[in-house]
Amino acid sequence: MNSISITPGSSLKGELVVPGDKSISHRSIMLGAIANGVTTVRGFLRGEDNMATMAAFRAMGVRIDDDGHLLSIHGRGLHGLEEPGDVLDCGNSGTSMRLLTGLLAGQNFFSVLSGDQYLRKRPMKRVVEPLSRMGARILGRAGGNLAPLAISGGTLNAIGYESPVSSAQIKSAIMLAGLYADGDTSVREPSLSRDHSERMFALFGASLETFHNGVTVKGGIELHAQEIHVPGDISSAAFFIVAALITPDSELLIRNVGVNPTRTGIIDVLRSMGGSIELVDEREVSAEPVADILVRSSRLKGVRIEGQTVPRAIDEFPAICVAAACAEGTTSIRDARELRVKETDRISAMAVNLRTLGVTVDECDEGMDITGVERLGGGVAESFGDHRIAMSLSVAGLVSADAVRVNDIDCVSTSFPNFFSLLERFRTGAP
């Protein structure tokens, strides 16, 4: 299926469960593989990105059993990985490539990381540079900025690193390398990015300390296997949250969603726009906050989004842009230049597509201004191979005057394989 046409449907009512959190699923494989013992994972996201991570560790000698419900990772210990006999293919996954670069920097073997045509265009110098400071030997195209990356691992030195951007991928790559460094490795960010790595490192028994916008990891500490329960991904829930808000007479309950405070910027933004969003039955599972999310259709208004809210909602901006297009007034997004180096340039991609649907969008280097319309128009939208762009534009089709055809939608399997079947179920009002 390479394109889909979405037409307006009925109100969205009922309950649903979204796939497991992609970030937590990646990290459960990585830490489980280098821990001692067998780590079990329930709720693992079997999207293409996470399967790329799984394949990489299998290629390094890690036994991973998967019965479709429970994942069992037979850890090899901190120094038990084997040299892969071929290039490790990360597919479209920037998380796989950047975090693996950090982990592989500390291994006593040679490895090569590559990916698809989109991933090979994404900047890698942001992790290569600090890892090189630690003593890693990493070569790549464009002076180490573009994959494929060739990594000759070995002994690493601890560093203190001031990251120029708030990025969980940069932070996590350095933290993973820090497990193999001699001494204490620290990373500080301009503002705190998602902290799944810090939580999971602590759960597995790593020695770490957190401080204001930063973390310190002690090298040489062995990890121990855990039982992991992965909650639903709030980035996937975001599409249905926005869909319920903008579709009249809707009420959706999304069960078992991770509501880590470093990830709930989407909820804060949509509430500030007037959205009715309630967290129900808040609890903690595997060191992560979890809740059910109750959403009711709401009249939205434009707001300004900037500062520390941005990294807490960085992956949800395509969905936020659709909400802004349906809101009264203008929504201004600033401090969001990171969106330009995601799977695609998400600022440009959303601007182009929203204009196609009749929305006025003014683009700037670090963000955009979106002036909402009473009703979106129809048209042909392009995903640019970006799963979040494809899903956001499909949500727009729920409330458009005419059909929205979204091209190049196979990318959705990266993070939400059953997205379109769920969307169709609610769009048609099927039970």
Swiss-Prot record:
Reaction equation(s) it catalyzes: 3-phosphoshikimate + phosphoenolpyruvate = 5-O-(1-carboxyvinyl)-3-phosphoshikimate + phosphate
GO MF annotation: an example: 3-phosphoshikimate 1-carboxyvinyltransferase activity
Keywords for this protein: Amino-acid biosynthesis, Aromatic amino acid biosynthesis, Cytoplasm, Transferase
Transferase among keywords: yes
One annotated GO biological process: chorismate biosynthetic process
GO cellular component: cytoplasm
Positions that bind 3-phosphoshikimate: 22-23, 27, 167, 169, 315, 342
UniProt key word Transferase: yes
EC number: 2.5.1.19
Pathway stated in the Swiss-Prot or TrEMBL entry: Metabolic intermediate biosynthesis; chorismate biosynthesis; chorismate from D-erythrose 4-phosphate and phosphoenolpyruvate: step 6/7
Main location class: cytoplasm
Gene3D superfamilies cross-referenced by the UniProt entry: Enolpyruvate transferase domain (3.65.10.10)
Pfam family, one: EPSP_synthase
Active site: 315 (proton acceptor)
Residue numbers binding phosphoenolpyruvate: 22, 94, 122, 169, 346, 388
Uppermost EC category: transferase
Localization terms from the record: Cytoplasm
InterPro entries membership: Enolpyruvate_Tfrase_dom (IPR001986), Enolpyruvate_Tfrase_sf (IPR036968), EPSP_synthase (IPR006264), EPSP_synthase_CS (IPR023193), RNA3'P_cycl/enolpyr_Trfase_a/b (IPR013792)
Complex and partners: Monomer.
Family listed: Belongs to the EPSP synthase family.
Record function comment: Catalyzes the transfer of the enolpyruvyl moiety of phosphoenolpyruvate (PEP) to the 5-hydroxyl of shikimate-3-phosphate (S3P) to produce enolpyruvyl shikimate-3-phosphate and inorganic phosphate.
Protein name, per record: 3-phosphoshikimate 1-carboxyvinyltransferase
